[in-house]
């Protein structure tokens, strides 16, 4: 079974942010703190405002259905940038 690229991208972003928060000494690293940091980075780096609650909803959707697809291209581009690429399409070239 082929792995869902949206889930892989989301998981990669979560791992990057989780490591950053732990290195920074954040006392409580959990879904809310990770989603808040991701939302802040997407807003700062990509100019697209997204609520941390929306990201936590995506997280839950992936837990229920590993084939879930993030419906917003701007979020995908922001996650791709957070993962060190220009955007989602650039990230996808390295994923495939």
Language-model features, listed with the residues they occupy:
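Short C-terminal boundary/hinge segments that cap the last helix of small helical domains
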Residues: 67-69, 85-96
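A short, Lys/Arg-rich alpha-helix, primarily the initiator
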Residues: 1-41
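DNA major-groove recognition helix of helix-turn-helix/homeodomain DNA-binding modules
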Residues: 73-88
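Surface-exposed polar/charged interaction patches
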Residues: 16-23, 45, 65, 82
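Intrinsically disordered regulatory regions flanking bHLH/HLH domains
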Residues: 19-26, 48, 55, 88-94
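Recognition helix of helix-turn-helix/homeodomain-like DNA-binding domains
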Residues: 26-29, 41-71
């Amino acid at each position: 079974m082929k792995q869902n690229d949206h889930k892989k991208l989301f998981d990669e972003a979560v791992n990057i942010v989780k490591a950053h928060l732990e290195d920074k000494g954040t006392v409580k690293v959990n879904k809310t703190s990770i989603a808040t940091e991701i939302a802040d980075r997407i807003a700062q780096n990509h100019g697209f405002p997204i609520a941390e609650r929306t990201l936590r909803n995506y997280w839950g959707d992936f837990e229920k259905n590993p084939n879930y697809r993030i419906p917003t291209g701007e979020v995908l581009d922001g996650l791709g940038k957070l993962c060190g690429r220009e955007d989602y399409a650039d990230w996808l070239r390295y994923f495939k």
